[in-house]
């Protein structure tokens, strides 16, 4: 399967490839279809985020080209670092959650880095919102409260994924609302 790098996205033009990639774990967004319940509903090109594309290349599931040149994992990762702020942190959390079996999608509409599903979009609502942080960064109590309000109003659990870039370890902290 082949994708083409277009700015900070990956375009899968072949419809059969688009279906196969989506079927592997709800990767990407088909053009013109908001939340397909199955890969068979896809009848258009698929757009992957650069993070998804880098992950799929690392797993050997996808080849990505730019101007006719095949891009390997290291090159794509470096492109991510130069084009996307916090790429190392975001990619670390994305990869870790995918390796744990979760379906990880953009959480931007919720003010989070990722919306995380146990089954998949279109089948369930995402139970978790994840914010990826460098363990050396600071976050204020007001920021945590703001994230918490959004997650609570959308009935999702808020999780901070805290990354140590030196050793690659990630700690997760979940916040829950209590009625007292």
From Swiss-Prot:
The reply on keyword Signal is no
Q: Can you tell me which residues form the catalytic site?
A: 117, 125, 156
BP term (GO), one: tRNA splicing, via endonucleolytic cleavage and ligation
Gene3D superfamilies reported for this sequence:
3.40.1350.10, tRNA intron endonuclease, N-terminal domain
Alphabetically, the GO molecular function entries are: lyase activity; nucleic acid binding; tRNA-intron endonuclease activity
Q: From which domain of life does this come? A: Archaea
Reaction catalysed by this enzyme? pretRNA = a 3'-half-tRNA molecule with a 5'-OH end + a 5'-half-tRNA molecule with a 2',3'-cyclic phosphate end + an intron with a 2',3'-cyclic phosphate and a 5'-hydroxyl terminus
- The entry's protein name is tRNA-splicing endonuclease
- Give the classification, highest ranks: Archaea, Thermoproteota, Thermoprotei, Sulfolobales, Sulfolobaceae
